[in-house]
Amino acid sequence: MMIFSTAVLRLCATSRIGAVTKRASSTFLSSASSSSSSSSPTQSMPPQRYTHHQFQRHSYSTTTTTLQQQQQPSPPLSTAQLVKQLRLLTGAPMLECKKALASPDVNNDLALAQEWLRKHSSQKIGSKVAGREALEGLVGVCIDNCDGGSRGVLVKVASETDFASRSEVFTGLVQEIADAAAAAAGDGGDIVDIPTFLSNTQSITTGKLLSECLNDAVLSIRENIQLDSIVTIGTTPSSRSVIAGYVHGRAPNSTCGTSAALVEVEVLPKDGGGGDDAVLSEEEKSVAMEAAKKLAMHVVASNPLYLNPESVPVDVVEKEREILMEKMTDSNKPPEIIEKIISGQLRKFYEGICLTEQSHLVEEGNPKISKVMKGLGLVVKDFRLVGMSK
């Protein structure tokens, strides 16, 4: 009983203390509120409260205002910004960009300014640099591995200086021409008329005529740029042929170089195979591609003139034979011995100018190319070599 009374007394004391604390806290907050209201010149407003529908309307209004602010058009570019952007697009000097934008027909329109530069500056610069020698440049390559076989193209584009030929503008132009030439060669075979090709063929990447692309490059680089030659290989492709290439002296960040070669290799049908039109297996294609690539490297290094002895013109062989006969005039050897000597010297002559008769510079031990191809079940059908000095 004594223990229960003690617990009750403690509980009552705790309740009294809590009540006193609560009254003191209320008195303090009340006095603080009255003092702040008396010191403030204006009476503080109660916090704004929204009903559910009012809150929805308020949120929609705020969102609409934010979207309208985001959709406001950006301020127009300044003249300096327009000049800088036009220079980045065309590569033209600052003064010409400023002149183009200030033209009454342009009125600070970037698209019209580019057209203005093409019409006025390109013609002026083109006529100015037309007579200059263009002895530097690059060779571009494009191989189109289509369903019916492969086609390859080499294009030689010349510039005045090596510095210009290494620029991004020039390498881009060379590759554009090579890609377009590969597509054109697939439609109509060899490309002979270069001016007509440039005037009638569109860039695959930009859709502009190649002649316009070339003029744009002249405007940007300020040098004489000429498409010197277009060489094609495999324009009537076979399903059993592959083409591989090698580019030497590549420009930075480019597939173009100072010289390049393409080699076409045909896979011979195996005994009991599907015939000439049978589709190559992945293994056959891989072996043929590797062999063609190595041959292309060899071609760039050795610079052969003909594919095999049968492809050497008769007049070239006869002229070489006459030279060899003159050397043997005072030898006092029997005619049959002289003929054997001349035949041996002609074989050496073929080794120097015919691809299939040369020692393979890329294969270990430098075996004869015709022997390497026979061992792989391949035949070299054709090759092309283009270089800035060839």
From Swiss-Prot:
Residues 1-24 form a transit peptide. Pfam families: EF_TS. It is found in: Mitochondrion. Keywords: Elongation factor, Mitochondrion, Protein biosynthesis, Transit peptide. Residues 30-40 have a biased composition (Low complexity). Residues 30-54 are annotated as: Disordered. It comes from the Eukaryota. PANTHER family: ELONGATION FACTOR TS, ELONGATION FACTOR TS, MITOCHONDRIAL. Associates with the EF-Tu.GDP complex and induces the exchange of GDP to GTP. It remains bound to the aminoacyl-tRNA.EF-Tu.GTP complex up to the GTP hydrolysis stage on the ribosome. This is Elongation factor Ts 2, mitochondrial. It comes from Thalassiosira pseudonana (Marine diatom).
